[in-house]
């Protein structure tokens, strides 16, 4: 038997017990004739004691143990004289009588500690060592608990977990597919699913009225902190439902997860916000509502006073940062440089302070009377000590997005984005379509299977850009954690949708004929939602990136530096797949 207990299990009630432990050497220290070793496994740390006076040979062997050696010990549980309140086993120690070295270890390239000295690249290369760290391991334990709670919740509501294929056909609409060549069918390719979207709709046609799957999904797209080329969805679909049914079901799931995993009781219904309001007041379809700073439009007040930057702008708007009038010129200049960064793209920033006597002092005083500045102050509801920050531009949507970045930056600087505070909302009434300059046509904002709002269906023939989708996203603290829609279940409406999106009947049949044909055999009204498991875990764990809640993630270039993937394959494999590699030079 390698162990009778784990390294996180023993307590003061176990004193005088004979036990056996196995684990890794975390650290060792020698004090006089005593050697102390912290033994670690995934359950915790237990202090081992070797006494030179009792057994000099055993103590000498203990002194030769290196970091991360794998050892087995047998000994007696003893009450610890100098207790450690920071760990659950801090009241006890083990007086070791037997030591067995199970394996030696090279010195790790970084310290296996919560606060490691390893950078991201080295940690990713030696991910199997990084996973020994409590800070990373606890994220995977949280992920495990979340999947258990998801399954329990959905099972209690009659959902059935069904696995769908990972090798499917390619559908070029949307993000790029990862493709897999077929050896058995030369010149033909599978695609890895971006989501099980069409397959779960087919399950609804099949009569599986409540489906879910914890599904691996793949998208060949540029990476960010909250994106990986492969990610995991809590994928769900329901038949005979309307939007309200789905929102109720999955708001319930969110509340269940908050209660069981974070101990947070969310009793109030989640706020609902139309997409148009989210963009108008926050410049984002995933607004962070942990703090205020709602946008105020100032075109009526600030235009027409001789300040050409505002006079020539299509949009003038700002935010009010409460109590921030103490910002220095240096801080304001830094904010100006922040919004002028290429990835944000503003031309500049105007600011105004509300003084203690209620007067307003701005960076454009020479163009505006105090009367106009007071009107501006009233529009914001600003008080003495507040700071008003204003952006303008000739593209309304672009300027709102720039103002969104400024709002988030101010929220961070003022300590308003507390990771232990959670504000949830549903964003609803999305546009059905968005114009693609690159494609020169309307594109589906979500996907082509989204049902339009019933009252907007007549607009499909007259003004498709004005059609709203029966779609909904759940947003928590400015992060989109899930989204879904009511689906089209009528073959004629689906064909009309493809037509608006520029599909010829032949192209629609070639790519989605299997779904349109299925609809002819009695498709029920249905809809669904997919939660991002990685995003939920990172949110609950307080992480800035989803990478640390994935066991073996890719880096920002989409590479697995531990496995050195992607990599070239040998010529024999290429020949079997009937492939020729022809890499074009960058011009």
Swiss-Prot record:
EC number per UniProt: 6.1.1.12
What broad class of enzyme is this?
ligase
Q: Where is this region: Aspartate?
A: 197-200
Q: Which GO terms describe its molecular function?
A: aspartate-tRNA ligase activity; ATP binding; nucleic acid binding
What PROSITE patterns does the entry give?
A: AA_TRNA_LIGASE_II
The organism's superkingdom is given as Bacteria
Instruction: Answer yes or no on keyword Cell inner membrane.
Output: no
Q: Which GO terms describe its cellular component?
A: cytoplasm
Check the record and name the InterPro entries matching this protein: Aa-tRNA-synt_II, aa-tRNA-synth_II, aa-tRNA-synth_II/BPL/LPL, Asp-tRNA-ligase_1, Asp-tRNA-ligase_1_N, Asp/Asn-tRNA-synth_IIb, AspRS_core, GAD-like_sf
Q: What's its catalytic activity?
A: tRNA(Asp) + L-aspartate + ATP = L-aspartyl-tRNA(Asp) + AMP + diphosphate
- Keyword list, A-Z: Aminoacyl-tRNA synthetase, ATP-binding, Cytoplasm, Ligase, Nucleotide-binding, Protein biosynthesis
Compartments where found: Cytoplasm
Protein family: Belongs to the class-II aminoacyl-tRNA synthetase family. Type 1 subfamily.
Q: What is this protein called?
A: Aspartate--tRNA ligase
């Amino acid at each position: 038997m390698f162990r009778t207990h784990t390294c996180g299990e023993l307590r003061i009630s176990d004193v005088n017990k004979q036990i056996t432990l196995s684990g890794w050497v975390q650290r060792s220290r020698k004090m006089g004739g005593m050697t102390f070793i912290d033994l670690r496994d995934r359950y915790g740390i237990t202090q081992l004691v070797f006494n030179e006076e009792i057994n000099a040979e055993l103590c000498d062997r203990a002194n030769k143990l290196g970091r991360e050696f794998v050892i087995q010990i047998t000994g007696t549980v003893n009450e610890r004289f100098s207790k450690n309140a920071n760990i659950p086993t801090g009241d006890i120690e083990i007086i070791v009588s037997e030591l067995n070295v199970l394996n030696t270890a090279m010195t790790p390239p970084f310290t296996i500690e919560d606060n490691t000295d390893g950078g991201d690249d080295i940690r990713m290369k030696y991910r199997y060592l990084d996973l020994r760290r409590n800070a990373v391991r606890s994220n995977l334990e949280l992920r495990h608990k979340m999947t258990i709670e998801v399954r329990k919740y959905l099972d209690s509501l009659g959902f059935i977990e069904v696995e769908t294929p990972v090798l499917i056909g390619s559908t070029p609409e949307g993000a790029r597919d990862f493709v897999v060549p077929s050896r058995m069918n030369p010149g033909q390719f599978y695609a890895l699913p971006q989501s099980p979207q069409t397959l779960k709709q087919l399950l609804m046609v099949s009569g599986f009225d409540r489906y879910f799957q914890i599904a691996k999904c793949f998208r060949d797209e540029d990476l960010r902190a909250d994106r990986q080329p492969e990610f995991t969805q809590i994928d769900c679909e329901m038949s005979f439902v309307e939007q309200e049914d789905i929102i109720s079901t999955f708001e319930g799931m969110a509340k269940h997860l908050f209660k069981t995993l974070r101990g947070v009781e969310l009793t109030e219904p989640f706020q609902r916000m139309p997409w148009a309001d989210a963009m108008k007041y926050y410049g984002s379809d995933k607004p962070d509502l942990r703090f205020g700073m709602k946008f105020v439009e100032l075109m009526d007040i600030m235009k027409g006073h001789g300040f050409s930057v505002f006079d020539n702008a299509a949009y003038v708007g700002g935010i009010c940062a409460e109590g921030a009038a103490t910002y220095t010129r240096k801080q304001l200049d830094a904010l100006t440089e922040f919004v002028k960064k290429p990835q944000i793209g503003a031309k500049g920033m105007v600011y105004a302070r509300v003084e203690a006597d209620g007067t307003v002092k701005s960076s454009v005083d020479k163009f505006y009377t105090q009367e106009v500045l007071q009107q501006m102050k009233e529009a914001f509801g600003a008080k003495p000590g507040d700071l008003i920050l204003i952006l303008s531009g000739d593209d309304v949507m672009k300027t709102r997005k720039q103002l969104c970045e400024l709002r988030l930056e101010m929220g961070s600087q003022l300590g308003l984005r507390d990771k232990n505070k959670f504000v949830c909302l549903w964003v609803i009434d999305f546009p059905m379509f968005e114009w693609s300059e690159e494609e020169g046509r309307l594109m589906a904002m979500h996907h082509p299977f989204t049902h339009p709002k019933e009252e907007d269906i007549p607009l499909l023939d007259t003004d498709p850009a004005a059609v709203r989708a029966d779609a909904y996203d759940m947003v928590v603290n400015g992060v989109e954690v899930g989204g879904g829609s009511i689906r089209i279940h009528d073959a004629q409406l689906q064909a009309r949708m493809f037509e608006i999106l520029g599909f010829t009947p032949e192209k629609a049949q070639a790519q989605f004929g299997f779904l349109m044909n299925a609809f002819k055999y009695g498709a029920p009204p249905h809809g669904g939602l997919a939660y991002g498991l990685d995003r939920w875990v990172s949110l609950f764990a307080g992480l800035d990136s989803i990478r640390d809640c994935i066991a073996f993630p890719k880096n920002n270039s989409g590479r697995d530096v531990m496995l050195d993937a992607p990599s070239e394959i040998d010529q024999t494999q290429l020949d079997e797949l009937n492939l020729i590699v022809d890499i074009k030079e960058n011009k």
